[in-house]
């Protein structure tokens, strides 16, 4: 109850303290994400150096395969030691935000950094961005635990850390902010917003001091696509929506494939993608690791459609195989690479058929990255901001928005569940779904009241609030209103609720239904 009393007595002080908490989280999450990014960058460089050295030396090829098997065994042991470090890491953070999971922050940090580095050194088709989100969140959780912050502040700081991790991974602070709100929280208040912004900006500042000011993708967009050609974007959006739904289906089937290997202990299954990676090293090395080599191929060379299609299909199934094993690594960057290749193939065909200038090919590549991301993750605003920041220009905002909206609708109509929600559901099922064990802790959460929601224009006492929560205050603009039974709730208010942490996930979902906008059928 101490945190509630503090908030009621000094709500502005609570918000101000969150700014400094965000700065602190941004420093530590940014440093950890930068270290992780440096390790993975150097691991990838070392990988291609090893391939170049061994490819004409059979003896050293055999030695390299032995090393790959050993690395697979080490990673497998790490994942058995700390299971929450497997996979992307984003579903685990979502689960903790909802109160379903309680990760061991220092074990996750150690196993994720070591395991992720070994996976990239081994050539597995995994990304650094999802792990960076988890590393940032765990760094924030560690700070909150060490400094003995309240449960409410710990959740805020973890959300901030997750965004800061993404900001450092992509040099994209706005995308980091929006990802935290759109994908992790689903709603927000001003206190949370300033905390996340301060963390993401601080983290991005640290990242840019190490990696420079250049965007992650150095695309040179000559001109925006003329409005007369927007029919091409409609078709592209439909294609990306279909491909995004198929991507989600295959990624989950990849997990099913490894899950069916009942006779092989889980810690040994990760060896399989390392062995397959060894074969890929000497047959199609461009699809190894995150995919930076693939991007340079379509931006610096003119490839045949058949060549791009081969690389696309190979990268797609190799990524599904690697991710399905439970290896510590994400799908964030690889899916952007796949989106880029879908755009390159589509753009090449459209340019050949319509005769529009060839420099529009880069437009199709960048737009497709955002559209494919949106179809898979179902976070359109994050997708638009991420690609805009990564390419260093906001001139193509309209075309990005058109494709993202269409791909979102197509994937939704196909009833394709957002990938991270599907993965979280599997994690909860695997762990027997245990709510947080901290039954004596209470957490303050904010819920925005939507226009036309159940709560709008109702008295507090007339709403069937779920058990295990207490409505504390209503934030209406800059005004802080003590919630009483006779208090009327307005659309646009932010309801502050005190929730038993043992029932956080269930209560949060119930209040979101009450406060969310009702969409007519």
Say what each PLM segment does.
Residues 1-432, 450-451, 476-477, 492, ...:
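Alpha-helical transmembrane segments and immediately membrane-proximal extracytoplasmic
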Residues 93, 440-442, 482:
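Short, solvent-exposed coil/turn segments
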Residues 110-118, 440-469:
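Acidic, Ser/Thr-rich low-complexity segments on the non-lumenal side of membrane proteins
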Residues 294, 442-446, 494:
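Intrinsic-disorder/low-complexity, polar/charged segments enriched in Ser/Thr/Lys/Arg/Asp/Glu/Gln
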Residues 365-366, 376-377, 439-441, 464-466, ...:
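A structural signal for short secondary-structure junctions
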Residues 419-446, 516-521:
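Long, charged amphipathic helices and adjacent flexible linkers at domain junctions
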Residues 451-505:
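Cytosolic Rossmann-like ligand/nucleotide-binding regulatory domains
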């Amino acid at each position: 109850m101490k945190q509630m009393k503090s908030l009621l007595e000094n709500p502005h002080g609570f918000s101000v303290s969150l700014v400094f908490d965000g700065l602190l989280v941004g420093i530590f999450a940014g440093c950890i994400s930068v270290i992780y990014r440096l390790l993975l960058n150097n691991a990838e460089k070392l990988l291609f150096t090893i391939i170049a050295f061994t490819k004409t030396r059979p003896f050293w090829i055999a030695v390299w395969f032995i090393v790959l098997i050993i690395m697979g065994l080490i990673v497998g042991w790490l994942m058995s030691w700390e299971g929450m470090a497997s996979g992307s890491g984003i579903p685990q953070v979502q689960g903790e935000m909802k109160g379903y999971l309680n990760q061991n922050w220092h074990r996750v940090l150690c196993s994720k950094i070591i395991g992720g580095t070994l996976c990239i050194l081994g050539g597995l088709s995994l990304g650094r961005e999802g792990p960076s989100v988890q590393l940032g969140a765990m760094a924030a959780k560690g700070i909150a635990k060490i400094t003995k912050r309240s449960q409410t502040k710990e959740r805020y700081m973890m959300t901030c850390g997750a965004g800061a991790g993404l900001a450092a991974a992509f040099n994209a602070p706005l995308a980091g902010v929006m990802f935290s709100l759109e994908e992790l929280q689903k709603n927000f208040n001003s206190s949370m917003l300033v905390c996340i912004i301060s963390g993401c900006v601080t983290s991005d500042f640290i990242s840019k001091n190490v990696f420079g000011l250049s965007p992650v993708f150095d695309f040179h967009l000559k001109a925006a696509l003329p409005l007369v050609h927007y029919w091409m974007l409609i078709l592209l959006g439909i294609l990306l929506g279909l491909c995004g739904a198929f991507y989600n289906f295959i990624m989950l089937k990849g997990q099913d494939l490894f899950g069916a290997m009942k006779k092989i202990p889980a810690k040994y299954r990760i060896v399989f993608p390392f062995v397959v990676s060894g074969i890929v090293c000497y047959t199609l090395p461009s699809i190894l690791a995150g995919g930076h080599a693939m991007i340079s191929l379509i931006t610096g060379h003119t490839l045949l459609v058949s060549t791009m299609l081969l690389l696309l299909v190979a990268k797609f199934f190799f990524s599904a195989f690697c991710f399905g094993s439970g290896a510590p690594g994400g799908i964030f960057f690889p899916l952007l690479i796949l989106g880029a290749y879908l755009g390159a193939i589509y753009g090449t065909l459209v340019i050949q058929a319509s005769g529009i200038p060839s420099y529009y090919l880069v437009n199709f590549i960048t737009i497709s990255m955002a559209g494919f991301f949106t179809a898979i993750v179902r976070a359109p605003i994050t997708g638009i901001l991420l690609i805009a920041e990564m390419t260093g220009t906001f001139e193509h905002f309209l075309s990005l928005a058109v494709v993202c909206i269409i791909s979102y609708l197509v994937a939704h109509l196909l009833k394709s569940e957002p990938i991270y929600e599907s993965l979280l559901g599997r994690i909860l099922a695997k762990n027997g779904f245990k709510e947080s064990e901290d039954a004596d802790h209470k957490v303050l959460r904010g819920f925005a009241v939507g226009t036309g929601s159940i709560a709008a224009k109702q008295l507090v006492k007339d709403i069937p609030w779920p058990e295990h929560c207490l409505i504390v205050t209503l934030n209406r603009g800059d005004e802080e209103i003590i919630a009483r039974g006779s208090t009327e709730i307005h659309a646009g208010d932010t309801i502050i609720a005190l929730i038993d942490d043992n029932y956080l996930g269930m209560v949060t979902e119930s209040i979101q239904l009450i406060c969310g906008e009702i969409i007519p059928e």
